[in-house]
Structures are given as C-alpha cells and as structure tokens.
UniProtKB/Swiss-Prot annotation:
Record-annotated disulphide pairs: none
The protein, known as: Cytoglobin-1
Tissue distribution: Expressed in all tissues examined with highest levels in brain, eye, gut and heart.
Positions with a binding annotation for heme b: 78, 110
Gene this chain is encoded by: cygb1
Annotated organism of origin: Danio rerio
C-alpha cells in the first residue's frame, strides 16, 4: 500500500461487515500494545513524506530530520493522541451512536479550531495503513486485513468530510 492506501471518499459508514469488524479489532491489539512507537512512526512518515502537513503544528513545524522528529516530546504526545483516537474508533465499531459522536467531535475540532484541510485525513489514513503493513507484517500482510482496514480509513475520511461540510468548511477557511 502506498500513497493514500486505497482510501476512498465514497466509503459509507455502514460498509464494514461483521467480519471486517472482527479482523480490525483482532489485528489492532498488537498495534495498540505498541502505540507509543507506532504513533511516532506514523507521524514521522506523515511529516517526512508530506511536510506541508506540519503547518498545522506549531510545536514541531520546523523539524526536518526524522531522527529529531522521533525525539520530539510534542510529536510523541500527538502520536499517542492519534493512536488513542483510532483505538476509540476500533473499540466502538459496533456502536453507531458512539462513532457518530466521535466523528463529530474530531471533525469539528479539526475544522473549526485547528483549521486542518480535510485532505490531510485521507493522506494520514494512507500513511497509517502503510506503517501498519510494514511494522506489523504478521498481522497486516493478508489482503483481507488490508481491505478491512482500508474500509475503516475510508469511513474515517468520509465522515470527516461530512462533518466539515456540516460546519461550512468552505466558508470557514477563507
């Protein structure tokens, strides 16, 4: 998987099957056990490959060297936040109301407070998938695992775009 990891905008929230949910939750356990390292790996890859994303992060906007990024306390903290948010999604895949609340809070925060362009959710989703496949090959090598995770990332991106549209993102970024 490279680039956007096959993440599609058209993934609707109900596109995960029960099998997808089980696959995602089972393969997530070893990742979350290594969340500190995984979160840093995701953000270092994200900012190295897409340096324009750093514009939204004043605490590590100037970092260029991946080794320096790995040691940055604020980057580590944000990596934990990303993985914790993903963990909350994974834990609640069968609770549509809870997921809707999570997506609304995350989307509104990033649209209104942080003013993050929603395209970065698609980019970050692809980076997450790439890092998971590379760092956890025993779990993420099978095509069906990658397909299930790609659906989840597509749902995340779809939902963020939905929330951004609801809050009038086009008007708020001008």
């Amino acid at each position: 998987m490279e680039g956007d990891g096959g993440v599609q905008l058209t993934q609707s929230p109900d596109s995960l099957t029960e099998e997808d949910v089980c696959v995602i939750q089972d393969t997530w356990k070893p990742v979350y056990a290594e969340r500190d390292n995984a979160g840093v790996a995701v953000l270092v890859r994200f900012f190295t490959n897409f340096p324009s994303a750093k514009q939204y992060f004043e605490h590590f906007r100037e970092l260029q060297d991946p080794a320096e990024m790995q040691q940055n306390a604020q980057l580590k903290e944000h990596g934990q936040r990303v993985l914790n948010a993903l963990n909350t999604l994974v834990e609640n895949l069968r609770d549509a109301d809870k997921l809707n609340t999570i997506f609304n809070q995350m989307g509104k925060s990033h649209a209104l407070r942080h003013k993050v362009d929603p395209v970065y959710f698609k980019i970050l989703a692809g980076v997450i998938l790439e890092v998971l496949v590379e760092a956890f090959p025993q779990c993420f090598s099978p095509a069906e695992v990658q397909s299930s995770w790609s659906k989840l990332m597509g749902i995340l991106y779809w939902q963020m775009n939905r929330v951004y549209a609801e809050v009038g993102w086009e008007n708020s970024k001008k």
